[in-house]
């Protein structure tokens, strides 16, 4: 069964069409990436799922039934904007928010303490929200989203403010929840996280879908037009404008997107001529970041 299904959903604000005829479905127990540039309509879409906004056209189904006022109880929502009461203590905030989702105080208190320990905040249980760093507040907000054990999670930029260690911790918990049957809708600008976590994606721009489907199939469809290179020495051998369209450096490697019809062997020849030691030279599928840029750029051309 699909956990979520949108059919031709449209939302307007006066003369502005924020979302137009958007359709996608998310099977239960999967991680789905809702992607797009700033202002694309992602947050409006998430708010329609949460019934904060009502579509002007189209339909939304959640867990096999039309969305209604009970739908938010089945969803844990981590918004991009902070939604915590700054003068309340962590425990008080979590118990209060969990009670709104139907948990008893005892259930909420027990669950809150367990999650706080899991996220290394156990000693902060009686601290006020405004005493916490941004990263710590983000972890509390994540707990608020998962505390009532919802079957569906909507996480809008969940890694904001987190250092690499805590980002990895949240990622591992998200995958653990997925393995336990939760459906996760992830909205983020961090394409590397999408590649590691998402089963399928929908890329929207100006409120319209421009790319959707299983992530692996999408990457295959773009072909192996990228060379991943690891080398020691000067990188001037990559200054080949007739061959190289774009460079994407990460760590010790560089991804080189080839121009249409270009021969990757020209890069290798240039490296040898410059005396550069190549330790990796491999044709790979393009990273999602490159696909994102290409599709959005072509839409706005």
Residue locations for each model-derived region?
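Short, Lys/Arg-enriched, disordered terminal segments
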Residues: 1-2, 300-301
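ABC transporter nucleotide-binding domains
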Residues: 2-4, 11-205, 211
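Alpha-helix N-cap/helix-start and coil->helix boundary motif
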Residues: 10, 68, 91, 191, ...
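Short, well-ordered coil loops that connect the C-terminus of an alpha-helix to the N-terminus
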Residues: 15, 103, 121, 224, ...
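Residues that scaffold the ATP/ADP-binding catalytic core of kinase and kinase-like folds
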Residues: 70, 145, 218, 291, ...
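Generic structural signal for individual residues within well-ordered alpha-helical segments
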Residues: 94, 109, 116, 168, ...
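ABC transporter nucleotide-binding domain
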Residues: 171-258
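Short, charged/small-residue-rich alpha-helical element at the C-terminal edge
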Residues: 226-295, 301
């Amino acid at each position: 069964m699909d956990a979520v299904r949108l059919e031709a959903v449209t939302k307007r604000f006066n003369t502005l069409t924020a979302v137009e005829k958007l359709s996608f479905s998310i099977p239960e127990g999967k991680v789905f990436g809702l992607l797009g540039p700033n202002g694309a309509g992602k947050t409006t879409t998430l708010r329609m799922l949460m019934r904060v906004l009502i579509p002007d056209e189209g339909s939304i189904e959640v867990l096999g039934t039309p969305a209604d006022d009970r739908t938010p109880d089945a969803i844990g929502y981590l918004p991009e904007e902070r939604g915590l009461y700054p003068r309340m203590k962590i425990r008080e905030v979590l118990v209060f928010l969990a009670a709104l989702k139907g948990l008893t105080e005892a259930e909420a208190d027990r669950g809150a303490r367990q999650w706080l320990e899991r996220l290394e905040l156990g000693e902060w249980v009686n601290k006020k929200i405004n005493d916490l760093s941004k990263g710590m507040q983000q972890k509390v907000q994540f707990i608020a989203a998962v505390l009532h054990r919802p079957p569906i999670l909507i996480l809008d930029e969940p890694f904001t403010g987190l250092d690499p260690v805590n980002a990895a911790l949240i990622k591992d918990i998200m995958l653990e929840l997925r393995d336990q049957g939760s459906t996760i809708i992830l909205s983020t600008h961090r394409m590397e996280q999408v590649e590691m976590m998402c089963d399928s994606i929908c890329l929207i721009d100006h409120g319209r879908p421009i790319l959707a489907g299983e992530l692996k199939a999408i990457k295959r469809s773009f072909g192996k037009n990228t060379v991943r290179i690891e080398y020691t020495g000067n990188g001037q051998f990559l200054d080949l404008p007739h061959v190289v369209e774009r460079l994407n450096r990460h760590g010790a490697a560089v991804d080189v997107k080839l121009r249409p019809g270009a021969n990757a062997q020209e890069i290798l020849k240039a490296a040898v001529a410059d005396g550069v030691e190549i330790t990796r030279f491999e044709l790979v599928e393009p990273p999602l970041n490159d696909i994102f840029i290409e599709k959005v750029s072509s839409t706005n051309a």
